[in-house]
Amino acid sequence: MDVTIQHPWFKRALGPFYPSRLFDQFFGEGLFEYDLLPFLSSTISPYYRQSLFRTVLDSGISEVRSDRDQFLILLDVKHFSPEELTVKVLDDFVEIHGKHNERQDDHGYISREFHRRYRLPSNVDQSALSCSLSADGMLTFCGPKVQSSMDDGHSERAIPVSREEKPSSVPSS
């Protein structure tokens, strides 16, 4: 059996304007030519410029922030309703799952599903975790940090997702 081994250079992003993994952030929004062959467009046409809008979208829509006072996860899930999202805390991990069945959009029928898993810092107060979905589809998972690490026998528990009527007010960094 032949096994193809790729050099690590082929697995890296080609610069800050190209995402390193295509499907991490955009759940079924469609691909552009430069998403598949980013180096080809500049080779064929030296005057071709990448869309600035797409570059802005690639600049941190999904992110994890951990500072002195809180742990925060921001995730763009605009194609999912709160009923289609599940957020669980299992031991020291946050698991976010989104799934919707096949439905019609502008280009035909589409179904989407994703799983994300994040490790919680040991000093996050797991009894005060919250999760909300803004009107513009930004999921915000937040947990305050405490001074001493609390270990009260970790177990699995679900975190409800609440709907907000206003757009997300958390600026991306």
Swiss-Prot record:
Residue numbers bearing the Deamidated glutamine modification: 6, 50, 147
Modification N-acetylmethionine, positions: 1
Segments of skewed composition (Basic and acidic residues): 151-167
Glycosylation sites per record: 162
Region (Required for complex formation with BFSP1 and BFSP2): 1-63
Annotated binding of Zn(2+) 2, by residue: 107
Function: Contributes to the transparency and refractive index of the lens. In its oxidized form (absence of intramolecular disulfide bond), acts as a chaperone, preventing aggregation of various proteins under a wide range of stress conditions. Required for the correct formation of lens intermediate filaments as part of a complex composed of BFSP1, BFSP2 and CRYAA.
Official protein name in the record: Alpha-crystallin A chain
Gene that this polypeptide is encoded by: CRYAA
